[in-house]
Structures are given as structure tokens and as C-alpha cells.
Swiss-Prot record:
The keyword Acetylation does not apply. This is tRNA (guanine-N(1)-)-methyltransferase. It is an enzyme of class 2 (transferase). SUPFAM superfamilies: alpha/beta knot. One of its GO terms (cellular component) is cytosol. GO terms for molecular function: tRNA (guanine(37)-N1)-methyltransferase activity. It comes from Mycoplasma pneumoniae (strain ATCC 29342 / M129 / Subtype 1) (Mycoplasmoides pneumoniae).
Length: 231
């Protein structure tokens, strides 16, 4: 899989991609990263990336022309182009799973007031992290990349993926490590019992309880999915 990030701030993107799991995935040749500063495609001598909005209003609007030129330089018939913007569909685990099937993913990071709307005609999907505004799309791009790359086969242990939060619409079960007694707060005895069936049942129960408590929206989806399977 190849992932290309179009950004004005490549110095923000590369450190994350060259660390931890992302670096391991690159080293294992499971993913290839490319970061393009689309400022280089500006045609004026000042390399102007934004301009005032037609019709007035506050803030500067990112010019579509240099971004389209950057797209033309890196896009192939196998590419999926994703614009990162607050009005996009909220990113989720199923979306990350779907993106793993993409041969070439291109992520466009915005900044300032937003994009010239004519750019929207040239993208395949619009993604956001949620109902809030960030200064730029780089954090969104890195979140999408991390969530997607770690699902690529061979990047991390398959068993770890099975028990992660959001699989089957449930949060992960609570985890504990040493010491056993932390200022009187002890690890649940069942986890020390050695009875794997009881431990598995306990963890499933905790998943249900935690999801209902912390993410009732997910819990409703879990129940709906369960009812659907039982029909």
C-alpha cells in the first residue's frame, strides 16, 4: 500500500511516520509513504497558496490550482483521493478497515479557512475526525494513516487486533499489570485464577459494561447488530 500526503507542513508529518509502528511498517515494506508539499506547484514567484474569498468574508481560502497540479503529478487510476475537512464523514474503524484495500491512498490536508470549493469535484471521499475544528489537516491525516496501517496484515500481531476497541462495536476489556496491589487497589482475582474460560467470560462481561457506560451510542449499535444476527 502506498500513502501520499499533500500538505503545506511536511515537517509535521514525517516525524510521526518515521517512528514506532509506522516506521516498522515501512521497514517491512508493508507500506510506502510519500509527503508532497503542494506549495511547489504554485505558479507565482511568491508561491501563494491562498487568497481572499470571492464575495468577502473573513479568512483566506486555499487555492485549488496548486493542489490539482499536485494531484495530477501523483494520482494514478488506482488512487483513492480523500479530502480532510470538518464537513466530511466522521472517521471510524470500519472506514479504516475499508481503506486497507486501497492500493494508493492520497490524503489532502487543508489549513486556514478552507479549500476553494471547486477542489471537491476532484476527490473521492471527504473525511473528518469529528464535530470540531483543527488548525490544519495534518493531525487528521496521521490519525487516518495510523488507524489504517495498523490493520494491514503483518504490521502488528493479529491477536492484538481481535481484542481491540470498536471491533464488534464494543470497547476493549480493562487491562492490568504489575504490581498486583497498587495502594490497596488490587487486580481482580479472576485474572489470576488460570481458568481461561472464566477469564474470557469476565472480559466479555467487562466489554459490555464498559461500552454501555462510556459509549452508549456504540452499545446500541452492538445490540442492533446482535438482534439482526439472531433473526
Amino acid at each position: 500500500m502506498k500513502i501520499t500526503v499533500l500538505t503545506l507542513f511536511e515537517q509535521v508529518v514525517w516525524p510521526y511516520l518515521n517512528a514506532s509502528i509506522m516506521a516498522q511498517a515501512q521497514k517491512a515494506k508493508l507500506v510506502e509513504f510519500e509527503v508532497i508539499n503542494w506549495r511547489q506547484y504554485c505558479k507565482d514567484k511568491h508561491q501563494t497558496v491562498d487568497d481572499m474569498a470571492y464575495g468577502g468574508g473573513g479568512g483566506m481560502v486555499l487555492k485549488a490550482e496548486p493542489i490539482l497540479k499536485a494531484l495530477k503529478a501523483c494520482r494514478t487510476p488506482q488512487s483513492k483521493v480523500v479530502l480532510l475537512s470538518p464537513e466530511g464523514q466522521q472517521f471510524s474503524q470500519p472506514m479504516a478497515q475499508a481503506l486497507t484495500q486501497t492500493e494508493h491512498l492520497i490524503l489532502i490536508c487543508g489549513h486556514y479557512e478552507g479549500f476553494d470549493y471547486r477542489l471537491y469535484k476532484h476527490v473521492d471521499q471527504i473525511i473528518s475526525l469529528g464535530d470540531f475544528v483543527l488548525s490544519g489537516g495534518e493531525l487528521v491525516a496521521l490519525s487516518v494513516i495510523d488507524a489504517t496501517v495498523r490493520l494491514i496484515k503483518g504490521v502488528i500481531n493479529d491477536q492484538s487486533l481481535i481484542h481491540e476497541s470498536f471491533n464488534n462495536y464494543l470497547l476493549d476489556f480493562p487491562a492490568y499489570t504489575r504490581p498486583y496491589d497498587l495502594d490497596g487497589d488490587k487486580v481482580p482475582e479472576i485474572l489470576l485464577s488460570g481458568d481461561h474460560k472464566k477469564i474470557e467470560a469476565y472480559r466479555k462481561e467487562q466489554q459490555l459494561l464498559r461500552t454501555a457506560q462510556y459509549r452508549p451510542d456504540l452499545y446500541k449499535q452492538y445490540l442492533a447488530k446482535k438482534d439482526e444476527k439472531n433473526k
